[in-house]
Structure formats: structure tokens, C-alpha cells
């Protein structure tokens, strides 16, 4: 925020995440954080010059409403940037039985309603009443995939970060390893 001179408003449904964000953000940064439902944003139309969403869409059970809320709060000519978990187009390339089993495990483990393809979400954005009609999308898997193994090794590099959180965090972290490995496999398969 300071580097670019932005005023930033971050939202999450988690009061704990808001508390943590406030603790980690230097006072001089022009950032504020709010507990808010992304499917029911309490901002006026055209409030923001830019909207940035990172890995939130996979958690949304209504992708159209999610897109509508982001685009509604974006000023005309503003920028929307999204980074999210998507699937390949499952109509064009249906999943194998093994892929269906793994996809079910990923959705259940991380409590996601469903993944959709980049093209499907692009269509939702293009056809939205608040859209300028211009959407540029890309698959960045090859750039982001290496970070999956880093997330496992981070616990080994800094074990006190996990150990200090207590037994529940340790058990959860160990449970996450197979799911992270499955997600890595799934990213490579599309």
C-alpha cells in the first residue's frame, strides 16, 4: 500500500484473520480490514479503482454472485485481478475415475463447493451486467505449482512456527500433507 500509494481494504469472513492482518500490518500503511461476506459486499457501487481476489473464488458456492459483487464495487474502467483454483474444462475433457476420487477428496478436505474452469469463470465475468466485456485470462499453473512443495517444507524449515501453535495445529499440518500432494498432482493433470 505504501509503495504504490494505495488505500487498501481487505475483507474476510474470519474475525481471526482480520485480527492477524491488523497485527501484521504496519501502522503507517493505508490498510484496513473488515469481516464481510464476499457474496454480500457492504460497499457502494464503483467504490474501488481495483479489486484483487486471491484464492477466494474456490470457497464460493455461487460463482456468479461472487463475480457480480466484485464487479459491482469496481469503478467503471477499474481493474479486477483474480488468482484462483480452477479445474480444466471438464465438459471437453471429462475426469477419469481416479481424478473424480481425488477431486472429491480435495473438495471435502478444504470444504470447497466446486472448482470451475478458467473459461467458465471468464464467461461469468464477461456476461456480468457490470462487466466492461474485456477479460484476459491465463493458466499460471507452471509458475505457481512449485510453491506446493514449499508449503510442506516450510514446516520443516521452521518447525517452531507450527509447534508453537499446539497439538491441534501439528495434527492439522500433518493431515494437510497428503492433500497438498494430491493438489500438486491435480494441478499437473488440470
Predicted regions and their residues:
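Active-site-proximal loop/turn and secondary-structure-junction residues that shape catalytic pockets
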Residues: 17, 56-57, 86
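A short glycine-rich, Lys/Arg-flanked "PGG" loop and its adjoining helix->strand segment in the class I
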Residues: 64-79
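A short acidic, Gly/Pro-enriched loop at the edge of an enzyme's catalytic core
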Residues: 39-51
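Substrate-binding/catalytic lobe of Class I Rossmann-like enzymes that use SAM or dcSAM, i.e.
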Residues: 93-189
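Acidic carboxylate diad motif detector
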Residues: 82-84
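Class I SAM-dependent methyltransferase SAM/SAH-binding core
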Residues: 1-40
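A short SAM/SAH-binding and catalytic strip from SAM-dependent methyltransferases
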Residues: 49-62
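Short conserved AdoMet
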Residues: 26, 61, 75
Amino acid at each position: 500500500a505504501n509503495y504504490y500509494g494505495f488505500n487498501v481494504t481487505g475483507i474476510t469472513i474470519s474475525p481471526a484473520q482480520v485480527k492477524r492482518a491488523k497485527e501484521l500490518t504496519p501502522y503507517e500503511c493505508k490498510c484496513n480490514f473488515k469481516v464481510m461476506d464476499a457474496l454480500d459486499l457492504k460497499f457502494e457501487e464503483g467504490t474501488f479503482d481495483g479489486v484483487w481476489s486471491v484464492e477466494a473464488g474456490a470457497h464460493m458456492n455461487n460463482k456468479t454472485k461472487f463475480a457480480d459483487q466484485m464487479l459491482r464495487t469496481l469503478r467503471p474502467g477499474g481493474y479486477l485481478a483474480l488468482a484462483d483454483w480452477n479445474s480444466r474444462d471438464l465438459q471437453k475433457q471429462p475426469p477419469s475415475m481416479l481424478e473424480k476420487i481425488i477431486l472429491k477428496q480435495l473438495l471435502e478436505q478444504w470444504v470447497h463447493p466446486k472448482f470451475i474452469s478458467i473459461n467458465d469463470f471468464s464467461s461469468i465475468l464477461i456476461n456480468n451486467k457490470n462487466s466492461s466485456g474485456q477479460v484476459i485470462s491465463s493458466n499460471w499453473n507452471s509458475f505457481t505449482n512449485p510453491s506446493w512443495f514449499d508449503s510442506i517444507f516450510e514446516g520443516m524449515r521452521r518447525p517452531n512456527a507450527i509447534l508453537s501453535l499446539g497439538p491441534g495445529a501439528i495434527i492439522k499440518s500433518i493431515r494437510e500433507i497428503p492433500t497438498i500432494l494430491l493438489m500438486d498432482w491435480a494441478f499437473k493433470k488440470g
